[in-house]
Amino acid sequence: MEMGRLVFGLCLILIVGTFLEFSGGATAAKGVTYDGRSLIIDGQRKLLFSGSIHYPRSTPEMWPSLIKKTKEGGIDVIQTYVFWNLHEPKLGQYDFSGRNDLVKFIKEIRSQGLYVCLRIGPFIEAEWNYGGLPFWLRDVPGMVYRTDNEPFKFHMQKFTAKIVDLMKSEGLYASQGGPIILSQIENEYANVEGAFHEKGASYIKWAGQMAVGLKTGVPWIMCKSPDAPDPVINTCNGMKCGETFPGPNSPNKPKMWTEDWTSFFQVYGKEPYIRSAEDIAFHAALFVAKNGSYINYYMYHGGTNFGRTSSSYFITGYYDQAPLDEYGLLRQPKYGHLKELHAAIKSSANPLLQGKQTILSLGPMQQAYVFEDANNGCVAFLVNNDAKASQIQFRNNAYSLSPKSIGILQNCKNLIYETAKVNVKMNTRVTTPVQVFNVPDNWNLFRETIPAFPGTSLKTNALLEHTNLTKDKTDYLWYTSSFKLDSPCTNPSIYTESSGHVVHVFVNNALAGSGHGSRDIRVVKLQAPVSLINGQNNISILSGMVGLPDSGAYMERRSYGLTKVQISCGGTKPIDLSRSQWGYSVGLLGEKVRLYQWKNLNRVKWSMNKAGLIKNRPLAWYKTTFDGPNGDGPVGLHMSSMGKGEIWVNGESIGRYWVSFLTPAGQPSQSIYHIPRAFLKPSGNLLVVFEEEGGDPLGISLNTISVVGSSQAQSQFS
């Protein structure tokens, strides 16, 4: 009986779902308020499903398709952060071009009839470099981030007002008839508030009042901030907000979930986190059953951390396990199963938003959440929390529910959806090589010069902090020194400690060893044998970062780089060079001359491949050219033959790669790196790779990316 009802109900939903609207389209929004049940847009309650898409993690050419697929998945709102360090890379100098064109992104959302939740922050975390804060903030005198600190509050308010004024000037707030129905100030402040003591509480109160004072005409939210001041709405982030969120801090605020994690971030050396479609659907349905009226999937499309935008140790692909993968392809059954959930819930929006809730116990681990109204009908959520299937009696009918599942009863009778029953077929992503770069004569090589102490312009008698010198303009800083050996040294070795992410140690121009940390190991310790000569010996150590941190209290106090250098001779006491004279060189020559651009290729002397010498060279720049693949589908570079570095295509960085950092299963965390079609020309594309460790460019391949199996959200009920 239940299966017949399920088939009938889903058929009906999928037929009428396209035409179902609660109270008008996004482009007609004139005002947004709220009460304890939901947001109210143009005087009508809204039950909203939202999906996070971050505009700089894809290209403007991708935005229309991503938004279209998101809308077709039953999503009403697109939620995005605003990226301060992209928009104000230098104090007072703003950039809203290309992937940074926030206005264009929002207007595209509006053109497709969806709403926007604009998370201004401007601290955002987001696994983004420095949590979105521009690095120049650290050099402002007296600066302490995210607390009751006047320098920080000044710059935070200035940027927040800049974004609000930009949105107003384009008429993009709902109060102006635009699509923006919500704005967010700050981000997950509960994680750090205790570290600032009473200044944390006063800061969050100030932040809320400052935001409200900007008069956007739409509500402000704070995620993971239980003490959000009125009228700011505090919201939940997590995987199980239906179980963990006690609700907003006022009965007059709606229950909202701003981050329902569809997967989880991934760092180098770790496997991807796989969250099932069934689990996401269960907790989303439970949140609605418990009076939730806004759910945002974080991420709905993750995209790519182009350039150096990822935070410490995070891979370049972002939330690839989302309903729309890194390339914007449907990930089934996650996409389709959630689409059916949205349709099922929206079919009963009226009783959900207008009806009275009743909670019934139907067994030791079974409940019913019933919403009923004489004028608006009835809907019930039957919840089975048991690890085994359960037969549930409800209103004189029997329903069989799978383990850990929620069934949705339209009209409190017809079982139209069950979270644990997936009707959408799984698809599989396929990579197809279209070109292997295995012709040696097609590659050219340029090797970085290893600097020596005498040639450096900055010298001190101490090991300086890495980012104080680089200002986050580059990942790299050379530490150079020299010492004289007057007596024989048996079994010589060098020992280094670093709070940076990577070190490459050269002694007398020979690589002695390399080491790196991880998200879990914060201090890099390296002991390596070396060859020394009588007389003067040169030490050159390349310190590397893999992104700045994205979270935590007192981020402005974090320090990185070398902290100890010692030379040992057999069993004798080590020679501590930490307080010797050190010289510094910021960045790489190839970076300084922008060797990845066509116009700068002749600024260095490239070598042709000779007898295989192009392989396994540390600190090497490689270049070649290639033609773009036919078609318009996604494209990626397979980099499994390389080690660690960065990739540019026609001058655009597609991100860092680190395929030598293996997971416990012995595989790279990421092997294929996305090249957006917008970066490509039909022919004559320039590929430049900087390799830190040593790899074989002859093993790199160009691939097209596609899916086989279910490419649309179709099921046996459609």
From Swiss-Prot:
Keywords: Apoplast, Glycoprotein, Glycosidase, Hydrolase, Secreted, Signal
EC nos: 3.2.1.23
Pfam families to which the protein is assigned, alphabetical: BetaGal_gal-bd (PF21467), GHD (PF17834), Glyco_hydro_35 (PF01301)
One function term, GO molecular function aspect: beta-galactosidase activity
Keyword Nucleotidyltransferase part of the UniProt annotation: no
Residue positions of the active site: E188 (proton donor), E259 (nucleophile)
Family, similarity comment: Belongs to the glycosyl hydrolase 35 family.
This protein's name: Beta-galactosidase 6
Source organism of this protein record: Arabidopsis thaliana
